[in-house]
Amino acid sequence: MIHNTVLEAVGNTPIIRLRNMTGPEDAEILVKYEGLNVGGSIKTRTALNMIDDAEKRGLINENTVIVEPTSGNQGIGLALVGAVRGYKVKIIMPDSVSEERRKLVRHYGAEVILVHDNGNIGLCIEECVALALRMRDEDKNVFVPQQFENPANPEIQRQSTGREILSQVNKPIHGFCSGIGTGGTITGIGEVLKAANPDITIWAVEPENAAILSGGSIGTHVQMGIGDGVIPEILNQEIYEDVCIIKDEEALDTAKLLASKEGIMCGISSGTNVAAAIKLAKKLGKGKTVVTVLPDTAERYFSTPLFED
């Protein structure tokens, strides 16, 4: 098959069974490896669907400047889509995100605008959003997809990722867990999996230093892409029954083990998700199946503690 653009290759990522990270009495863990997606993360799906939706609704045209506040992967995804579709893109990011994220956005031809993270990621994200909305108010050509409240975000997880998981696993799924960034992944996939098995156990996952769903304090953490210190508008808070809190050290150690024990190169938030999945697998026990998502690839974390000896 010949694709007319790289965007036609988005999705259909593999499901992989973890063979070396669970005990004999634990449930099996299956991971949806989005690091192999076009653009290296699950967010390419979201970026493409938000732009497709905006085009269909006549919200953008050849003069549009796409501006989005993000802690990383969504910006990379939008920069990629903009490169293919011919849109000018500006990405507003906390200055605490990895250097690789910034470079990837620029590599796709987009502009990076940094906002200082003064130790509270929630306030920083709010400042990023406020700046994007000011830019929109000052320029009629600016379009802000607003991933935290755009229904096209969870919808693509329902229509693509969730359905892919059901088809690939092709047996009952007893547990699912996902870190909370925009809330699109856990909402979209969670709703699909719960429709297939109403008895499924679903956990939301948060960094210890940004556990807003659990009523914790908001600081800065290394689990980039989740734990933005806000409760997203699109998050279905009825879809999960519990919240699992993961320390930075757990996330980093688990991501490193995924590489050294399973040969899977993935980012820090993938370590977060798998650390939670291991806890859920122990709770559900042998004979059950737990699914989680590996949101991105490791190569955008060389400058972070993930690659420290």
Predicted regions and their residues:
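PLP-dependent amino-acid enzyme catalytic core
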Residues: 1-309
